[in-house]
Swiss-Prot record:
Cytoplasm listed as a keyword: yes
Keywords: Cytoplasm, mRNA processing, Phosphoprotein, Plant defense
The species this protein was found in: Arabidopsis thaliana (Mouse-ear cress)
Underlying gene: PAT1
Function: Activator of mRNA decapping. Involved in mRNA decay via decapping. Involved in disease resistance in response to biotrophic and necrotrophic pathogens. Is part of a signaling pathway including MPK4 and the disease resistance protein SUMM2.
Record-given protein name: Protein PAT1 homolog
Modification note: Phosphorylated at Ser-208 by MPK4 upon flg22 elicitation. Phosphorylated at Ser-200, Ser-342 and Ser-343 upon flg22 elicitation.
Length: 793
């Protein structure tokens, strides 16, 4: 304790005599001179140094300092009335005598010998940075500071009058509050500063409500003297991080700091100071949070130092600035304030509940209109979003955030979790679920008018997995590559394309496929909505809308109807349809389209006629890709299901489409290694017609159409069979004429190449003339062969 210069004078201080002298002096108009007491350094003025302001090699331990400042109960009880006055009086005197040493300690910039001018001098520091931010301190607050701090205090009458008030307001059992808090205390009244070099510490009971101002303190750890103001920091490198306070302002602090015992500033861990790096005059959030999280709630003002070290890590609320608020009753803010009430009051008065809403000129209004919420600061922080803004209020930011959440988080599993919900619905088909797999509402399909000269179309993402436009609509620039130079590779016939990528035919087909899949998703939504919702009109409007969507897809495919009544059927080349089905994803689109069309409708007939016109394009070549093979087989299965629900008229038109097509259908036997999809669907047509004819489920017009369609198909089938037989005989180097006995190898080739299943399915529909033609062909080609007789049985 010798470094502080108080090792011997502390225990020898005549506290009782000092109180008597102070009482005698307080009645007169003379200035209070604390230097007359040895307790204040009368004998050791020159030798005393203010602890912590000079760099020392030795760091004082917590135990040593605590032992020197362990007062007796009698000493504390006698000196707590005097400690308010003599605390910073000696500090200011020391600073006035040695201004060069403490030139970096804050707003004290000039040296003055008059002690009465100190308080007024501290009130003219408007050029200093504002601790709480410039938006809180306005011109009105500065004006109030000047008026308040400029009041004359020429005697000790005012001080003497305030001492009993403190005793009344804060009796002995309640004196431990602010000693427990371990935070800086500032007063708004000027102090008569005697020449003294010793720093005393006020007892907890002598702190008035006017001193309990809401300036946040710097977090600390126990073990040394804690200085209450950042302006008196012994660390020069910490000054840029800790902006000086505006002394004399009732908004922030008073005119004098109070120093605390056994609370070191020089022993502060660097990690706590690093938390202050983001502090600037306009940012008070870090000050607020660290001040509240670092203050220990002591329950006894005379807590032993050993207990203080463990308690300093506990959070503690800030105390509101009450000394400057008119009409406030100090009794409301006694030592029994709870954490929630004190922190809530601080939150309400200084506006820390929402720093975003602070505007210039609002600091004075916050002092006049004070609210006292019942909930604490922690609850206030939880209710707010952790963001601050400079130009927008909290309500504006929260409204924008709410709109974003509505757009991206609809809380509808059908939209946000579409694929997962679809898998669950597929696995639990037929089960009674609490939440059905259906949309909550149906959206209108937007009109996507696209121009040919549009460089980049709009990509709209509806939800997870629901992309109306594919990224292929806006291809990546890396796809725009020039072909290799023909001269470099010696290929004179290879010429670079002149068309840009967005004008390539296959790109247009891919874009159409994506648009078509999106349209079919809309149809799915309508079906699920109709399934799980009861509508007043029975869903008539939605059914019409559904049919219109499906018809629009057929129109966009440019599918012509040969049986159109208006006679204005479109061309049957089906160019766009062929482009779409040439891609595997296009075949998936066709599969889904057929599954959604109502069976037996005209739209089903139109689409199936287009399919039967292009059986070779769909089933002519068998791909080596297993996925493509699977898709092709699934397409054949779906077509068979559609045929099973047709009437005789649509069946007749589909069979006529095969005969009228410019493409030769691949008439292969079932199980052919090169694909039997076309034969499968043709056999389904013949079997469905036989079933309808046996059931007499037809009319005269229907049976006539069927006879005409079958006659054309049978003629085509016989021509194909004869042509295939000739090719087999030529491959085996046999005479082209019908032989009486064919070899075993020729019989196997006929079975392997002839569409035997189609011939067998045609028997119920042939007439007598067609039967004679067929039997003549069989007798001449397979006469006497026992191996081929079971084929036609």
């Amino acid at each position: 304790m010798d470094a502080f210069g108080i090792g011997s004078s502390l225990n020898q201080a005549p506290v009782t005599q000092d109180l008597k002298k102070f009482g005698d002096n307080s009645t007169g108009n003379t200035m209070f001179d604390a230097s007359q007491y040895a307790f204040f350094g009368n004998d050791v003025v020159e030798e005393v140094e203010l602890g912590g302001l000079e760099e020392e090699d030795e760091i004082l331990s917590f135990t040593g300092i605590a032992e020197d400042f362990s007062f007796d109960k009698e000493e504390v009880g006698d000196s707590r009335l005097l400690s308010d006055v003599d605390d910073l009086a000696s500090t200011f005197s020391k600073l006035n005598r040695e201004p060069d040493v403490y030139s970096n300690t804050g707003p004290i910039t000039d040296r003055r010998s008059s002690q009465n001018s100190l308080a007024a001098e501290w009130t003219h520091g408007e050029e200093l940075p504002n601790w709480y931010g410039r938006q809180i301190l306005d011109s009105d607050a500065i004006k109030d500071d000047k008026v308040w701090s400029a009041q004359p205090f020429s005697s000790l009458d005012r001080v003497e009058q305030r001492i009993p008030d403190r005793t009344k307001l804060y009796p002995e059992p309640q004196r431990q509050l602010h000693q427990d808090h371990n935070q800086q205390q500032f007063s708004s009244e000027p102090i008569l500063v005697p020449k003294s070099s010793f720093v005393s510490y006020p007892p907890p009971g002598s702190i008035s409500p006017d001193q309990r101002l809401g300036h946040p303190n710097i977090p600390y750890q126990s073990g040394g003297p804690q200085m209450g103001s950042p302006n008196f920091s012994p660390f020069p490198n910490l000054q840029p991080q800790l902006p000086s306070m505006h002394h004399g302002s009732p908004q922030h602090t008073g005119n004098r700091p109070q120093f605390r015992p056994a609370l070191p500033l020089n022993n502060l861990p660097p990690a706590q100071w690093m938390n202050r790096q983001n502090m600037h005059p306009g940012d008070s959030s870090g000050i607020m949070n660290n001040a509240m999280l670092q203050q220990p709630p002591h329950q006894n003002g005379l807590m032993p130092p050993q207990m203080q070290g463990s308690q300093n890590r506990l959070p503690h609320p800030m105390q509101p600035p009450l000394g400057h608020m008119p009409g406030m009753q100090p009794q409301l803010f006694n030592s029994h304030l709870s954490r929630s009430s004190s922190s809530g009051n601080y939150d309400g008065m200084l506006g820390f509940g929402d720093l975003r809403e602070v505007r210039p000129g609002s600091g004075h209004g916050n002092r006049q209109n004070v609210r006292f919420p019942q909930q604490g600061f922690d609850a206030g922080v939880q209710r707010r979003y952790p963001f601050r803004s400079k130009y927008m209020s909290a309500g504006e930011i929260e409204n924008i955030l709410r709109m974003q959440l509505v757009a991206t988080h609809s809380n509808d599993p059908y939209v946000d979790d579409y694929y997962h919900q679809a898998c669950l619905a597929k696995k639990s088909a037929g089960a009674k679920l609490k939440h059905h797999f259906c949309p909550n509402h149906l959206r209108d399909l937007q009109q996507r008018a696209r121009s040919n000269n549009e460089p980049h179309a709009f990509l709209q993402v509806e939800a997870l997995g629901r992309v109306p436009f594919s990224s292929i609509r806006r291809p990546r620039p890396l796809l725009e590559v020039d072909p290799p130079n023909s001269a470099k590779f010696g290929n004179a016939e290879h010429k670079p394309t002149d068309k840009p990528l967005d004008q390539e035919p296959m790109l247009a087909a891919r874009v159409y496929i994506e648009d078509g899949l999106c349209l079919l998703l809309e149809v799915d939504d309508i079906d699920r909505f109709l399934e799980f919702n009861q509508l007043q009109d029975g869903g008539h409007q939605l059914k019409q809308r559904r049919q219109a969507l499906l018809q629009s897809l057929a129109v966009s495919l440019q599918l012509g109807d040969p049986l159109a009544k208006n006679g204005q059927s479109q061309s049957l080349d089906d160019f766009l349809f062929l482009r779409v089905i040439s891609l595997p994803k296009g075949r998936k689109l066709l599969i889904r389209y057929l599954q959604l069309i109502f069976p037996g409708s005209d739209l089903m007939r139109i689409v199936c006629m287009a399919i039967f016109r292009h059986l070779r394009s769909l089933f002519g070549v068998l791909s080596s890709d297993p996925d493509i093979i699977k898709t092709t087989n699934k397409l054949a299965t779906v077509i068979n299901l559609c045929i099973q629900n047709m009437e005789l008229g649509p069946v007749s038109t589909c069979l006529a489409a095969v005969s009228c097509s410019s493409e030769q259908a691949p008439l292969r036997p079932l199980g052919s290694p090169v694909g039997d999809g076309a034969s499968t669907v043709l056999k389904s047509i013949l079997d469905r017609a036989s079933e309808l004819i046996r059931a007499n489920n037809f009319n005269n017009a229907g049976i006539a159409l069927w006879r005409a369609s079958f006659n054309e198909f049978f003629n085509m089938l016989m021509r194909y069979c004869i042509s295939k037989y000739d090719s087999i005989m030529q491959s085996l180097q046999l005479p082209p004429h019908f032989a009486t006995e064919i070899s075993e190898e020729a019989a196997k080739a006929i079975v392997r190449e002839m569409p035997i299943e189609l011939l067998r399915s045609s028997f119920p529909h042939i007439d007598e003339q067609q039967k004679r033609i067929l039997m003549e062909f069989l007798k001449r080609s397979m006469l006497g062969s026992q191996k081929t007789e079971p084929v036609l049985s």
